[in-house]
Design a protein with these regions (language model features):
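Conserved ABC ATPase signature
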Residues: 161-165, 169
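ABC ATPase "signature
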Residues: 246-247, 255
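Short coil-to-helix segment of the ABC ATPase nucleotide-binding domain corresponding to the Q-loop/switch region
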Residues: 121-128
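Conserved ABC ATPase "signature" region
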Residues: 25-33, 90-91, 132, 139-156
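Helix-to-loop junction immediately C-terminal to a conserved catalytic motif
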Residues: 75
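A short, proline-enriched helix->beta-strand linker immediately N-terminal to the Walker B motif
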Residues: 180-184
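Conserved ABC transporter NBD signature motif
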Residues: 83-91
């Protein structure tokens, strides 16, 4: 197996008074009861995960389980209490603020649940904005932006302003904006959650086609287990800030490590064929992806 593009080792994020001192006093690994009795909130708890080039890792868990906080620790949008995060072999926790800005600008794409579109810019200008920041000339960035606008189904709304769009349309602009930069590492926090079911399915198809062309490394948060089955190479399930199990979708379905994991994987029908887990018929996500990727299309290349 190739070396991990992103590696997180024993990451912690505790909220409370002097969390670093608290961890030190408890040997760097206090149990959950000790954390709570000490008055701390365990947002991320001794979490380790490696993400390999071209892999889609999906993070699942109930609200408050630590999914979004973990992603923000991985991108250093928030500072971890303890642990190590490596990207392309570089220790991100030792990077300067300016170095992190450049890494996020050129190598990371992000779509979070709540993001701010620029209200004074049109849809086309919003999607092209990160390319403008990169210094790409106007004709190329607008061509790329137009392609992404078409991809997310917003043709005809290039000249609209965010206030003129529905919530779902605004989310699609955010997705297009993130896709425009062709990131090496892509963080997505429920990017399709505001879309209606038909558009959501279409966006999943387009997402897989893009992945077949670009081969990006992706960390994806969703509450939808069917979506996770369809998209993931591996799924990590979180509870109380910790990853309780990580593995291939079929492994989690057939051998859940805990009752909590079983809640996400039991009594599910997925795949267009309607295979049922309780019959032992589990469609492999790779087969679904391969079927979609046969129709992969070329994207406009960008250069400075």
């Amino acid at each position: 197996m190739s070396e991990a593009l992103l590696s997180c080792q024993h990451a912690w994020k505790l909220y409370g008074d002097d969390p670093e001192g608290f961890l030190a006093r408890h040997g760097g690994n206090p149990d959950l009861n000790t954390i709570r009795e000490g008055g701390y909130i365990p947002a991320v708890r001794d979490t380790s995960v490696d993400v390999y080039p071209g892999e889609i890792v999906i993070i699942m868990g109930l609200s408050g389980s630590g999914k979004s906080t973990l992603v923000r620790c991985l991108s250093r949008l928030i500072e971890s209490t303890a642990g190590q995060v490596y990207f392309e072999g570089k220790d991100l926790l030792k990077a300067t603020p300016q170095e992190m800005i450049e890494i996020r600008r050129h190598k990371m794409g992000m779509v979070f649940q709540h993001f701010a579109l620029l209200p004074h810019r049109t849809v086309l200008q919003n999607v092209a904005f990160p390319l403008e920041v990169q210094g790409i000339d106007r004709a190329k960035r607008e061509a790329r932006a137009q392609e992404m606008i078409s991809l997310v189904g917003l043709n005809g709304r290039e000249g609209y302003y965010p206030r003129e769009l529905s919530g779902g349309q605004q989310q699609r602009v955010g997705i297009a904006r993130s896709l425009a930069v062709e990131p090496e590492l892509w963080f997505l926090d429920e990017p399709f959650s505001a879309l209606d079911p038909l558009i959501r399915r279409e966006m999943q198809d387009e997402f897989l086609r893009l992945q077949s062309v670009l081969h990006k490394t992706i960390v994806f948060i969703t509450h939808d287990f069917d979506e996770a089955i369809r998209l993931a190479d591996r799924i990590a399930i979180m509870k109380d800030g910790a990853i309780v199990q990580i593995g291939r979708p079929e492994d989690l379905v057939m051998a859940p490590a805990t009752e909590y994991v079983a809640e996400f994987t039991s009594e599910r029908a997925f795949g267009d064929e309607g295979y049922l887990i309780d019959k032992g018929l589990i469609p492999m996500p790779s087969a679904d992806r391969a079927m979609v990727r046969d129709g992969a299309k070329s994207l406009t290349p960008l250069s400075m």
